[in-house]
């Protein structure tokens, strides 16, 4: 699924509106993923607490959203722009790429809750397509 120029513009516009709450979105989305898909906890077993609101969840949620924010600036070539991150997840962290989609679903849920007026059907579509493209780019080194 490719991103049209309109999709890219919509993602950039929406990201601009929500970026001030990116940390909260990341922490909530990660908390939801860990609760709804408990099998994902295996990647974070070294943390002291996987509870929603724990310092580890908040910190990693922020890291995730900073990475997504960086990807927004690299939409023209996500594979090249996210190569280092793809290598990290594939070779060092060994994260099953299915988890990228699981996290994306939770990010969409949180965005819809936090921005009901701005997260229109068109924004939803564009952000979903972007997160799918992002997940695909992060999966590049798995092939």
UniProtKB/Swiss-Prot annotation:
Residue stretches making up the Globin domain: 2-143
Gene Ontology molecular function, alphabetical: haptoglobin binding; heme binding; metal ion binding; organic acid binding; oxygen binding; oxygen carrier activity; peroxidase activity
Positions contributing to heme b binding: 89
Modified residues (N-acetylserine): 2
Presence of keyword Transport: yes
One cellular-component annotation, GO: hemoglobin complex
GO terms (BP aspect): hydrogen peroxide catabolic process
Miscellaneous remark of the record: Hb 3 displays a Bohr effect, which is enhanced by organophosphates, and a Root effect.
UniProt family annotation: Belongs to the globin family.
Name listed for the protein in its UniProt record: Hemoglobin subunit alpha-2
